[in-house]
């Protein structure tokens, strides 16, 4: 049978999602825990591989097993055998044609900036920090130039291995909630560092260094060197993955849980 899981994790102490030799990864910890529950080696496939320091509240994985377990056994059993900064949120049996990566129709990220003169102590690894004033309305205005199907070369890491820089941006919203600024981005898929590179450029607009129209110019320039700096990893969360309804996956609060689900 094939099982899908929803995963939440704090990426601070991991070298990204993907299992790698000699370094700590989220995938490795999850697979070790699931292998204990299944009593056989388990390998998972994920919806999107996150980089070192990046968090997830809506990661989705699947794995195959011939072991008959109640769904609660997968959630409770895995959580009992994992570090406390990784948690399984739900488990459900899925059709054999389901694939966590290839069945996904869209991914959604939130980038969170603590916009205050002083850095935070408690959430220091869960948010990015910018000390000067940021104009979230101008940042939102700038982000609208990225909507639709575009060539995102200017916002793509130089070592990105994706065959094409073209992606379809479904929404990009920038909102303020007290001292928190949230950049909420949804697209069919993302090139490497796309959200963090867009965020770095939006911060330049929010600071007043650039006008909102600059983002349109960056898009047309197709040159990574002229765009803003890559924003830090700690503010970024993979919060949701869309799938066709017939797969019947659970819908959970998007998160991260210190923010309201609906930010409008």
Curated annotation (Swiss-Prot):
It catalyses: uridine(38/39/40) in tRNA = pseudouridine(38/39/40) in tRNA. Substrate binds at residue 109. Gene3D superfamilies: Pseudouridine synthase I, catalytic domain, C-terminal subdomain, Pseudouridine synthase I, catalytic domain, N-terminal subdomain. The active site is at 51 (nucleophile). Its EC number is 5.4.99.12. GO terms for biological process: tRNA pseudouridine synthesis. InterPro entries: PsdUridine_synth_cat_dom_sf (IPR020103), PsdUridine_synth_TruA (IPR001406), PsdUridine_synth_TruA_a/b_dom (IPR020097), PsdUridine_synth_TruA_C (IPR020095), TruA/RsuA/RluB/E/F_N (IPR020094). Keywords: Isomerase, tRNA processing. GO terms for molecular function: RNA binding; tRNA pseudouridine(38-40) synthase activity. CDD domains: PseudoU_synth_EcTruA. It is an enzyme of class 5 (isomerase). Belongs to the tRNA pseudouridine synthase TruA family. Formation of pseudouridine at positions 38, 39 and 40 in the anticodon stem and loop of transfer RNAs. Homodimer. This is tRNA pseudouridine synthase A. The gene is truA.
């Amino acid at each position: 049978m094939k099982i899908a899981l929803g995963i939440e994790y704090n990426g601070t102490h991991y070298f990204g999602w993907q299992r790698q030799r000699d370094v700590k990864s989220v995938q490795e910890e999850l697979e070790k825990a699931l292998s204990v529950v299944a009593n056989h080696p388990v390998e998972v496939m994920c919806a999107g591989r996150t980089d070192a320091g990046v968090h997830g509240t809506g990661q989705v994985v699947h794995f195959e097993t011939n072991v008959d377990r109640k769904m609660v056994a997968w959630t409770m059993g895995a959580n009992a055998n994992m570090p406390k900064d990784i948690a399984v949120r739900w488990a459900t049996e899925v059709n054999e044609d389901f694939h966590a990566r290839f069945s996904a129709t869209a991914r959604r990220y939130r980038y969170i900036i603590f916009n205050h003169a002083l850095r935070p102590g408690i959430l220091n690894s869960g948010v990015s920090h910018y000390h000067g004033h940021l104009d979230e309305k101008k940042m939102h205005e700038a982000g609208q130039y990225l909507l639709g199907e575009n060539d995102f070369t200017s916002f793509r890491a130089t070592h990105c291995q994706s065959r094409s820089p073209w992606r379809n941006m479904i929404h990009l919203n920038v909102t303020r909630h007290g001292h928190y600024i949230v950049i909420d981005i949804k697209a069919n898929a993302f090139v490497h560092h796309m959200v963090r590179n867009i965020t770095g450029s939006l911060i330049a607009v929010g600071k007043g260094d650039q006008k909102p129209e600059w983002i349109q110019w960056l898009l047309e320039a197709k040159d990574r060197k002229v765009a803003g700096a890559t924003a830090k990893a700690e503010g970024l969360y993979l919060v949701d993955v869309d799938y066709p309804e017939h797969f019947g996956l659970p819908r959970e609060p998007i998160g991260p849980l210190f923010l309201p689900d609906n930010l409008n």
